[in-house]
């Protein structure tokens, strides 16, 4: 049985729902997994580092402070994330190389596209709680994303256990 974010919201009213700010850029529009976080401003050093580690089906949530001046994520980091088993990324900022990202088997949500890359200054924080789009994203909590939106829960959700019928 597959899930949708509307079904999750109906069955689990306690879930947090992100404000509808994000566009899909990846080859997968439906993805979920435990959250890992990065907080950075126009420096993707920590994103690159984390994407090169085993993802184990996690979702990388990046608080880029909503900057639209530089892209935090592109084809190279996207390819690393796929190779290392990440389920997807949610970026409060920009991506680039959108034609290539669209062909990757990876969920990619971001505010917009920007062709300018970041500078790498080795700055940023990993695995810290971040807040944007009206939601607290906590490492280890679960993110569910599809064409309807983004939902966050403290624990994994299962519609099969919940007995929801379609």
UniProtKB/Swiss-Prot annotation:
InterPro entries membership: RraA, RraA/RraA-like, RraA/RraA-like_sf
Keywords, alphabetical: Lyase, Metal-binding
Binding site for substrate: 74-77, 96
Alphabetized GO MF terms: 4-hydroxy-4-methyl-2-oxoglutarate aldolase activity; metal ion binding; oxaloacetate decarboxylase activity; ribonuclease inhibitor activity
Requisite cofactors: a divalent metal cation
Protein EC: 4.1.3.17, 4.1.1.112
Protein's UniProt keywords contain Transport: no
Binding site for a divalent metal cation: 97
Cofactor binding comment, as recorded: Divalent metal cation.
Gene3D superfamilies: Ribonuclease E inhibitor RraA/RraA-like
Record-level GO BP terms: regulation of RNA metabolic process
Enzyme class: lyase
Catalytic activity, as annotated: 4-hydroxy-4-methyl-2-oxoglutarate = 2 pyruvate; oxaloacetate + H(+) = pyruvate + CO2
Superkingdom, taxonomy of origin: Bacteria
Function: Catalyzes the aldol cleavage of 4-hydroxy-4-methyl-2-oxoglutarate (HMG) into 2 molecules of pyruvate. Also contains a secondary oxaloacetate (OAA) decarboxylase activity due to the common pyruvate enolate transition state formed following C-C bond cleavage in the retro-aldol and decarboxylation reactions.
Complexes and interactors: Homotrimer.
Family recorded in the similarity comment: Belongs to the class II aldolase/RraA-like family.
Name this polypeptide is given: Putative 4-hydroxy-4-methyl-2-oxoglutarate aldolase
Organism: Xanthomonas campestris pv. campestris (strain ATCC 33913 / DSM 3586 / NCPPB 528 / LMG 568 / P 25)
């Amino acid at each position: 049985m597959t899930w949708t974010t509307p079904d999750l919201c109906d069955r689990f009213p306690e879930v947090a729902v992100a404000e509808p700010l994000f566009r899909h850029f990846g080859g997968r529009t439906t993805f979920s997994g435990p959250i890992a976080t990065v907080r950075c401003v126009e420096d993707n050093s920590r994103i690159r580092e984390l994407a090169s580690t085993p993802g184990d089906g996690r979702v990388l949530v990046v608080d880029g402070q909503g900057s639209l001046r530089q892209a935090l994520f592109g084809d190279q980091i996207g390819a690393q994330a796929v190779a290392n088993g990440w389920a997807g990324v949610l970026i409060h900022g920009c991506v680039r190389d959108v034609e290539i990202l669209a062909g990757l088997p990876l969920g990619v949500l971001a505010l917009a596209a920007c062709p300018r890359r970041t500078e790498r200054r080795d700055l940023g924080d990993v695995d810290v709680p971040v807040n944007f789009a009206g939601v607290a994203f906590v490492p280890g909590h679960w993110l569910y994303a599809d064409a309807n939106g983004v939902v966050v829960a403290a624990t994994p959700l299962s519609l099969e256990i919940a007995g929801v019928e379609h």
